């Protein structure tokens, strides 16, 4: 259903508010450079510090601007199942083509709790849903066996696997077969994950290098393995630089250095440390981005 290079797009701010004009420009930048789908209100979009009105508005703007040219997959996850259902339902009403739901964080549900949470959302909202497993941020790991149970649900179509573990990704692909699509949640591991059967990436790096991330994925699916491998190696340094501090601080700084929006992030996120900014600038210059 979804495939290729999918960007987890940043949410630009200006004087504390969502910068709607810059958000529209960022959407155009992505589509013009070959991005296959757009995820607003993910981790990279600072969903955790958007209020409900802003969250809905960001999704609405992206849907409006995209005009059905590529799928829009709205971030609608929550650690409250009731809230996740409401947000996913509203995303559908706004015209989103799918939803990305992070595992419930902080309250640390069991595997059965995770299963029941996702099943409840999928039962309640007839919209294609992507599970999102990122234990480094949530404190809970959605195990392959649980993913396999959820893959039986018609509305659960994919998983963004961001453990950084090829073993876990491979186990999901092996257990689920064609019942669910797997996407890399870490740019540095996209190529090897696709070699194991992943269908693409939900990317941070694509915020600044959409054409190149798309080239990696497109080369792989065109059977041009050596070209894809070379793109993987070429993008490795810049992809790692996106995590010199907590995402999305480095990538938003990078987008700002390219003149595309402000570097403003919301507390408790802080601006990129000056020493890390110096490193980031040097790496971006190597890539000809600034």
From Swiss-Prot:
Q: In Gene Ontology terms, what is one molecular function of this protein?
A: 4-hydroxy-tetrahydrodipicolinate synthase activity
Intracellular or extracellular location(s): Cytoplasm
Keywords, sorted A to Z: Amino-acid biosynthesis, Cytoplasm, Diaminopimelate biosynthesis, Lyase, Lysine biosynthesis, Schiff base
Name the GO terms of the biological process aspect: diaminopimelate biosynthetic process; lysine biosynthetic process via diaminopimelate
In chain numbering, the residues marked as site (Part of a proton relay during catalysis) are 43, 106
Record function comment? Catalyzes the condensation of (S)-aspartate-beta-semialdehyde [(S)-ASA] and pyruvate to 4-hydroxy-tetrahydrodipicolinate (HTPA).
Under which name does UniProt file this protein?
A: 4-hydroxy-tetrahydrodipicolinate synthase
User: Could you tell me the gene encoding this protein?
Assistant: dapA
């Amino acid at each position: 259903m979804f495939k290729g290079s999918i960007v987890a797009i940043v949410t630009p701010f200006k004087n504390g508010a969502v910068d709607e004009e810059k958000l529209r420009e960022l959407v155009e930048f992505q589509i013009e450079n070959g991005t296959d789908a757009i995820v607003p209100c993910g981790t990279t979009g600072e969903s955790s510090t958007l209020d409900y009105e802003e969250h809905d508005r960001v999704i609405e703007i992206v849907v409006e601007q995209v005009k059905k040219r590529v799928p829009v997959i709205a971030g609608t996850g929550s650690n409250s199942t009731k809230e996740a259902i409401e947000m996913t339902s509203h995303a559908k009403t706004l015209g989103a083509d799918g939803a990305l739901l992070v595992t419930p964080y902080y309250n640390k549900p069991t595997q059965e709790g995770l299963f029941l949470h996702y099943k409840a959302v999928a039962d309640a909202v007839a919209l294609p849903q992507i599970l999102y497993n990122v234990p480094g941020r949530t404190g809970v790991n959605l195990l392959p066996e649980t993913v396999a149970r959820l893959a039986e649900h018609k509305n659960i179509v994919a998983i963004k696997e961001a453990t950084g573990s090829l073993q876990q990704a491979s186990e999901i692909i092996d257990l689920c077969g064609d019942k669910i699509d797997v996407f890399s949640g870490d740019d540095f591991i996209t190529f090897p994950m696709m070699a194991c059967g992943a269908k693409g990436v939900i990317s941070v790096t694509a915020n600044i290098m959409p054409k190149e991330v798309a080239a990696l994925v497109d080369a792989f699916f065109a059977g041009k393995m050596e070209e894809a491998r070379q793109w993987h190696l070429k993008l490795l340094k810049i992809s790692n630089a996106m995590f010199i501090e907590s995402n999305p601080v480095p990538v938003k700084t990078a987008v700002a250095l390219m003149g595309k929006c402000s570097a403003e992030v919301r507390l408790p996120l802080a601006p990129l440390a000056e020493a890390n900014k110096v490193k980031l600038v040097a790496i971006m210059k190597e890539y000809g981005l600034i």
